[in-house]
A protein has these predicted regions:
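Alpha-helical adaptor scaffolds
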Residues: 359-383
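Structural detector for internal amphipathic alpha-helices that build alpha-solenoid repeat scaffolds
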Residues: 1-16, 26, 34-48, 53-57, ...
Length: 576
């Protein structure tokens, strides 16, 4: 009743009753600093001002987290004592507390500038940078310029973050920091460049950065600029996958829409339908390892394009609905897909909806082409990896055909048949001695830990491997030996065994498309088993420990897949 009869409309700030206030006051003496910090924070947010003495007392707490919460509580309350207490906290031992105090004072106006001038030489770069923005003028410029010219990435990052909101405090060229080796400095540079004229191309280049935090910072910076929409559209037309992802997410977060964006989304859906059609065509014939990788690539490209199209038509108001629409479009149930299309139509993206129809039909638009026709069309695609895999599939078919011709030449002595075959005798198919880039990527995509990684990224990862061959029966890894290598099996198989009472006890056989030796790498312990090449020998790719750890750190999905395989193997070995 009190809620509905309150004279002031809208949400009301809840007030502490006496019992709750006593409970929170008691928590200020709790042994856990986390509990004390929460208590003082609640007193600041929910209190009516009479708890100020308790909050001021918490500024003397031994734990910096409690002091930080107490200072924030005073600032939020806007209490008359807040300014004096904040100035006192500029001398706190914790940089987090000093930084909050400096930020608060910098908002109070020039009357407090001299208080901040005293900490322009603070040991913490974040505190110095915040103090400089509050002091302003030539002293601030000298402080920030010194930080930018220092060799410390922490100094440079802090100065750049301060300049994002105070670009007038330096005359130095900030574009050079877009190429800094430290990703945090590059991210801060993107924010600092946002308000500067002529910096659009430099910020745009950071959309393709290898670090996700830099890409996000770059997209956020472009979204603030007048030329941001034009630069985003240029990225969608010509940018890399990473740049496109960052641009689309920023457009969705900021709610930017337009006819050009809708047209682009329609084209992406049409492209997805084209890829799906060829994927279905390839599924009608026998599948080699390369065809399997090509089909997987077509499916992942199709999924990516559909996701991009939905993201391009998403606004903050429709984000939740678009998530549901996306699930519906991917459903195996035809009725669910139809309902998803209707939902998409209801938000007014008619061009995208029309483009979706061929993508959702059972066989696309019209009859499917035969697999050879599909491969020929895909061999002329604008996507480099689709072309490469299609050409490799065609090459493999030609090799099979030539093998068939040679068999005919040996079996059929008809002069007419021999004459027909003779023109092909000049073509010699040689067994490649080393694996090329396509071979390596195809081999890696057969391995579960790499199956979810795009060929473009696998192309770089493949350079970390060393190719090796092992003869039949050759010992690859020895029980008890130190191990800093794992083996991806490309051709052949290996036997994993353990010596026991003078004999080798087989544990399992590992075939092509799998790997061995990873456990010793991960644990840093000697080999727990012998690994021996099978009767046909082994062709494989060796990966050293440092490279494996780098891959797992960069690609969490590879780490999860490796853990799943490891758990399965340990379970199998335990049952033995």
């Amino acid at each position: 009743l009190e809620v509905f009869t309150h004279p002031q409309a809208g949400l009301q700030k809840p007030l502490l009753d006496a019992d709750t206030q006593r409970a929170l006051a008691g928590e200020l003496n709790a042994p856990d600093p986390g509990a004390r910090a929460v208590a003082v924070s609640l007193l600041g947010r929910l209190g009516d001002g009479v708890q100020t003495d308790l909050i001021v007392g918490a500024l003397q707490d031994a734990d910096w987290r409690v002091r930080l919460a107490a200072l924030q509580a005073l600032i939020d309350q806007g209490h008359p004592e807040a300014a004096g207490a904040t100035i006192t906290m500029l001398e706190d031992s914790a940089p987090q507390v000093r930084s909050l105090a400096a930020r608060s004072i910098s908002r109070l106006g020039t009357d407090y500038a001299e208080s901040l001038a005293a900490i322009l030489e603070d040991p913490d770069p974040g505190v110095r940078a915040v103090a400089a923005t509050g002091v302003g003028g030539i002293r601030a410029q000298k402080t920030l310029d010194r930080m930018l010219e220092s060799d410390s990435p922490a100094d440079q990052e802090a100065a750049l973050r301060a300049l994002a909101s105070h670009p007038d405090l330096t005359e130095l060229d900030l574009v050079r920091f877009a190429g800094h080796p430290d990703r945090r400095v590059r991210a801060a540079a993107a924010a600092a460049l946002a308000p500067l004229a002529g910096s659009g191309p430099a910020i745009r280049s950071l959309l393709d950065d290898g670090s996700v935090i830099v890409r996000r910072a770059s997209a956020a910076a472009l979204a603030q600029r007048a030329d941001g929409p034009a630069l985003f559209m240029d990225v969608l037309a010509n940018g890399s996958v990473r740049a496109t992802e960052a641009a689309l997410q920023s457009l969705a977060d900021t709610g930017q829409t337009g006819e050009g964006l809708t047209e682009w989304a329609s084209q992406e859906v049409a492209r997805a339908a084209f890829l799906r059609r060829h994927r279905l065509a390839l599924a009608t014939s026998d599948s080699s390892a390369t065809r399997t990788v090509l089909a997987t690539l077509l499916a992942s490209r199709q999924e990516r394009l559909l996701r991009w199209a939905l993201l391009a038509t998403t606004t903050p108001h429709t984000a939740d609905m678009m998530t549901v629409v996306g699930r519906g479009l991917r459903s195996a149930d035809q009725e669910t897909r139809a309902q998803a299309v209707e939902a998409l139509e209801s938000v007014g993206v008619h061009a995208v909806t029309r483009s979706l129809i061929p993508l959702l039909e059972e066989t696309g638009h019209g009859a499917l082409p035969d697999s050879r026709t599909s491969l020929r069309e895909l061999s002329e695609d604008h996507d480099e990896w689709i072309r490469a895999l299609a050409v490799r599939c065609i090459t493999e078919e030609l090799i099979d055909d030539l093998g068939h011709l040679r068999g005919l030449a040996d079996a059929d002595q008809s002069g007419l048949v021999q004459s027909a075959i003779a023109r092909w005798e000049v073509i010699a198919v040689q067994d490649t001695q080393t694996l090329d880039t396509v071979d390596r990527v195809v081999a890696l995509q057969r391995v579960p830990m790499f199956a979810g990684i795009d060929p473009e990224d696998l192309e770089r990862i493949a350079t970390l491997f060393t190719e090796r061959r092992y003869d039949a029966g050759e010992l690859i890894f020895a029980w008890g030996a130190e191990g800093d290598e794992m083996l991806i099996i490309v051709e052949g198989e290996v036997t994993v065994s353990r010596p026991q009472e003078g004999a080798e006890v087989p544990i399992r056989t590992v075939r092509s498309g799998d790997y061995v030796g990873e456990l010793s790498l991960l644990r840093g312990q000697p080999r727990a088993a012998d690994v021996t090449a099978g009767p046909e020998g082994v062709r494989g790719l060796i990966l050293r420990g440092a490279q494996l750890h780098a891959i797992l750190e960069e690609r969490p999905e590879a780490a999860m897949a490796m853990l799943a395989t490891l758990a399965e193997r340990l379970g199998t070995d335990w049952n033995r």
